[in-house]
């Protein structure tokens, strides 16, 4: 069953993905890149967020894989591991890992099943290899979400779209947090700024996707929701490893007139990640799952936004990248306290979280932390 028709209520700000009006040159560029398609509008949340009976999160791509890690049950969470893909023939392939993140979400409610791909990792060979080994069928996807415009989360997208052309459902929704997602970026953590890429608008247009902006909270495939913009409401601060450029260069980048007025005149500026979104699920009898992907806006901020959007106070699990690797121990401990104060049942750090966070949590709150690797399957609910 396909996602519900997309609608958009007033009251939640929107910057159209597609450009309308403007100069003849800009209009021609938009038509060439986007095929003249109409803007897509996210189905906003009115009333209660969806509730599901069961949610399964599969880590498609993460930083590393430990083939000997055992499966089992941690608290009320079923944890499945993938070792070697053995058969009656010698194993020719294994799961690949890289500094990137991609997750697959499958939810059940009664007889309904929904499948969502969240982020695309760093490279398409890794993504395609792992999807095949893990048995994830692109034809079953009901939606895709791109959490933010960093290459280690969208780098595998174009190759994935081309490899699965004609195999996916037509007009598959791709949710993003806004036009800023398309801005060109440079990596600035080293001595010299280096190219960190930009989303390929032409490839996305050719893939027959419905690119859907969700600057506010939005329902995903009837079963899940995204937070929309994540306010900075706690001690957490953005420590950006990149800077972004507003403008179009050789068909890549973000349209200035689709950016907030205070961002339009910017050449290069530090990322504030106003476009970053988290994907969430309300599991019956358990509470919220919050998938932060990279957590540039702060993992505690993301959880608080999910709670505010849903009206739910119970947080069952927080999983994804928390972007704590660049921070010192005091900040890491403050983040742990913030999650403990929210009474989170399970914490599953991935990707850019860093080892200090895991080691402290494992030593002090071992029943809360779950170690995750590429291929790990986490089952929440009945």
What are these regions (language model features)?
Residues 1-13:
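N-terminal secretory signal peptides
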Residues 10, 20-35, 39-112, 226-275, ...:
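Zn-dependent metallo-beta-lactamase
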Residues 56-60, 116-119, 224-230, 288-294:
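Active-site-proximal beta-strand elements of phosphoester/diester hydrolases
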Residues 62-63, 120-122, 149, 179-180, ...:
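Active-site metal-binding loops of divalent metal-dependent hydrolases
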Residues 91-99, 107-143, 158-159, 166, ...:
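Pre-active-site segment of Zn-dependent metallo-hydrolases
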Residues 105, 119, 131, 148, ...:
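Divalent metal-coordination and catalytic microenvironments
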Residues 142-215, 228-239, 340-346:
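Active-site HxH/HxHxD metal-binding segment of metal-dependent hydrolases
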Residues 143, 150-154, 173, 258-376:
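Cap/insert and terminal regions of metallo-dependent hydrolase folds
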């Amino acid at each position: 069953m396909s996602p519900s028709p997309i609608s958009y209520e007033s009251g939640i700000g929107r910057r159209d993905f597609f450009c309308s009006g403007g100069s003849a040159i800009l209009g021609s560029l938009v038509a060439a890149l986007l095929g003249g398609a109409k803007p897509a509008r996210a189905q906003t949340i009115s009333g209660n967020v969806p509730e599901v009976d069961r949610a399964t999160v599969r880590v498609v791509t993460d930083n590393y894989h430990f083939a000997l890690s055992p499966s089992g049950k941690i608290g009320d969470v079923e944890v499945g591991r993938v070792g070697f893909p053995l058969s009656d023939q010698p194993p020719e392939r294994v799961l690949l890992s890289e500094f990137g993140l991609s997750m697959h979400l499958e939810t059940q409610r009664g007889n309904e099943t929904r499948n969502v791909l969240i982020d695309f990792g760093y490279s398409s060979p890794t993504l395609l290899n792992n999807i095949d080994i893990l048995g994830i069928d692109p034809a079953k996807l009901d939606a895709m979400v791109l959490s933010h415009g960093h290459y280690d989360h969208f780098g595998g997208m174009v190759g994935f779209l081309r490899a699965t052309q004609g195999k996916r459902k037509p007009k598959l929704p791709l949710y993003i947090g806004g036009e800023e997602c398309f801005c060109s970026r440079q990596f600035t953590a080293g001595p010299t700024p280096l190219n960190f890429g930009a989303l390929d608008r032409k490839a996305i247009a050719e893939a027959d996707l419905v690119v859907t902006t969700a600057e506010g909270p939005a329902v995903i495939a009837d079963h899940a929701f995204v937070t929309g913009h994540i306010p900075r409401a706690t001690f957490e601060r953005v420590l950006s490893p990149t800077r972004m450029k507003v403008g179009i260069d050789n068909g890549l980048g973000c349209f200035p007139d689709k950016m907030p007025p205070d961002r339009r005149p910017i050449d290069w500026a530090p990322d504030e990640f106003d476009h970053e979104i988290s994907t969430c699920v309300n599991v019956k009898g358990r509470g919220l799952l919050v998938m932060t992907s990279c957590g540039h806006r702060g993992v505690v901020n993301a959880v608080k936004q999910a709670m505010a959007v849903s009206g739910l106070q119970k947080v069952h699990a927080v999983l994804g990248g928390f972007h704590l690797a660049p921070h010192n121990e005091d900040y890491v401990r403050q983040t742990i306290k913030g999650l403990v104060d929210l009474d989170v049942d399970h914490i599953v750090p991935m990707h850019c979280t860093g080892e200090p966070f895991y080691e402290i949590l494992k030593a002090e709150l071992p029943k809360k932390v779950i170690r995750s690797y590429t291929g790990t399957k986490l089952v929440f609910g009945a």
